[in-house]
Amino acid sequence: MKDIDVVIFDIQDVGVRFYTYISTLHLVMEAVAENNKKLIILDRPNPNGHYIDGPILENNFKSFVGMHPIPIVHGMTIGELGIMINKEGWLKNKINCDLKVIPIENYDRNIIYDLPEKPSPNLPNKKSINLYPSLCLFEQTPISIGRGTEMQFQIIGNPD
């Protein structure tokens, strides 16, 4: 990172704790902080920003698919979450990231937001984004949630 002055983070999140883009943000923030660089987050609407739901992650269960003690559906934008990570001291050794968030214009979290582009090949539409917080809980079980089909996170079944 020696030849880098600033890192720009422009990735669409879906507002779910185990959607690993927020873990990637966390690791980027640590790398930027450790190298005394600046991070700019281009904030984006959260398609699940209109509600907060689910248990808060307990620290002894932290992993890449859950790094922060937040509810499953956290209601924050990626920029708000970056600010929270910084202010709560969740980065390694409680380091602080030189962070600037470019806010979203005219964003209202009470309005259900449809993403113009799919955030991931695994979340192809609004229905899959809406069902992801609940159906993803079955992902490490023998239950199928449509992975490898055109209806990922929209169907549930037993492959036997």
Which functions belong to the PLM regions below?
Residues 1-2:
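A short, aliphatic-rich alpha-helical micro-motif
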Residues 5-6:
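Structural motif
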Residues 10-12, 42-45, 104-105:
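Active-site-proximal beta-strand/loop segments in catalytic clefts of secreted hydrolases
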Residues 14-25:
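Glycine/threonine-rich flexible loop motifs
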Residues 34-38:
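A short helix->loop->beta-strand "cap" motif at the edges of active sites that frequently abuts
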Residues 40-62:
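Glycine-rich, charge-decorated loop segments at or immediately adjacent to ligand/cofactor-binding or catalytic sites
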Residues 62-134:
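Conserved anion/nucleotide-ligand pocket segment
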Residues 129-160:
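Internal helical hairpin/lid segments
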